[in-house]
Curated annotation (Swiss-Prot):
Swiss-Prot/TrEMBL GO biological process terms: translation
HAMAP family: Ribosomal_uL18_B
A Pfam family reported for this protein in Swiss-Prot or TrEMBL: Ribosomal_L18p
Alphabetical list of CDD domains matching this protein: Ribosomal_L18_L5e
Name of this protein: Large ribosomal subunit protein uL18
Keywords from the UniProt entry: Ribonucleoprotein, Ribosomal protein, RNA-binding, rRNA-binding
Summary of subunit composition and partner proteins: Part of the 50S ribosomal subunit; part of the 5S rRNA/L5/L18/L25 subcomplex. Contacts the 5S and 23S rRNAs.
Amino acid sequence: MVSSKDIIQRRARRVRRRIKMVSGNRLRLSIYRSNQNIYAQIIDDLRGCTLVSASTLDGDLKKSLKSGSDKEAAFAVGKLIAERAKKAGVNEVVFDRGAYVYHGRVKALAEAAREGGLNF
C-alpha cells in the first residue's frame, strides 16, 4: 500500500523532473505553502542562489493582511514577487509548484504573478 507521503514525494519529483527538462536556463519561481503562510522565491539554479523572495511575513504585507493563509494573501504575495522581480530585471521564470496541486492559494499566487508581469 502506498502512503500519502509517498504520493506527495512522487508528485514533487515528477514536477521537478519536468521543470528540468523544459526550463533550459530560465529562473525558477518556487513556492512553499504552510498552514499559516505562503512563501515565494525566484531561484537561479545555475548559480545556486535566491534572487528575490516574498512571503506573507514581510513587514508591509503582514500589516495589511487579516490572515496569511487565504487566497487574498497568496494574491498579494504574487503581486509582490512580480514587482520585486521586475526591479531585479527578471521577466521569464518557470513556475515550480512542488507537490502542491494547482488550485486555491497556489493558483492565486501564480495568477497574481502573471498579472504583475512575470511570464511562465
